[in-house]
Curated annotation (Swiss-Prot):
Entry keyword annotation includes RNA-binding: yes
Cited InterPro entries: KOW (IPR005824), Rib_uL2_dom2 (IPR014722), Ribosomal_uL24 (IPR003256), Ribosomal_uL24_CS (IPR005825), Ribosomal_uL24_KOW (IPR041988), Translation_prot_SH3-like_sf (IPR008991)
Assembly information from the UniProt record: Part of the 50S ribosomal subunit.
UniProt-listed GO biological process terms: translation
GO MF annotation, one: structural constituent of ribosome
Protein name in the entry: Large ribosomal subunit protein uL24
Gene expressing this chain: rplX
UniProt keywords, alphabetically: Ribonucleoprotein, Ribosomal protein, RNA-binding, rRNA-binding
PANTHER family in the record: MITOCHONDRIAL RIBOSOMAL PROTEIN L24 (PTHR12903)
PROSITE patterns: RIBOSOMAL_L24
Family to which this protein belongs: Belongs to the universal ribosomal protein uL24 family.
HAMAP family with a match to the protein in the record: Ribosomal_uL24_B (MF_01326_B)
Superkingdom of this protein's organism: Bacteria
Organism this protein belongs to: Desulfovibrio desulfuricans (strain ATCC 27774 / DSM 6949 / MB)
Length: 110
């Protein structure tokens, strides 16, 4: 399984594409397709047929579409900048724990 430096509920900035510069929260990670679903970005309109069995009205619906994971960067909660993420081990109570940290300000991101 692939390891991503982005996790669900992370605050990320889109760095490429039509929504470049927008900041949003990661709603879902699609590991098989290397994509993430970011809140309020890459919005598209879909024409939905009414479905009376599911009580779904028809019409034009706006929804988010996935963005490739290489086109987003994590926004650090400490410095507020889009940054790369690194990993380091921290020893606490005799146990070593692997944590993510901001490469710009070296603050732990958890």
């Amino acid at each position: 399984m692939k390891m991503y430096r982005i996790r669900k509920d992370d605050k990320v900035m889109v760095i490429a594409g039509k929504d470049a510069g927008k900041i949003g929260k990661v709603l879902k990670i699609l590991r098989k397709k290397d994509r993430v679903l970011v809140e309020k970005t890459n919005m598209v309109k879909r024409h939905m047929r009414p479905n009376p069995y599911a009580q779904q009205p028809g019409g034009i619906v706006e929804k988010e579409m996935p963005i490739h994971v290489s086109n987003v960067m994590v926004v650090c909660s400490a410095c507020g900048k889009a940054t790369r993420v690194g990993y380091k081990t921290i020893e606490s109570e005799g146990k070593e724990k692997k944590v993510r940290f901001c490469k710009k300000c070296n603050e732990v991101m958890e």
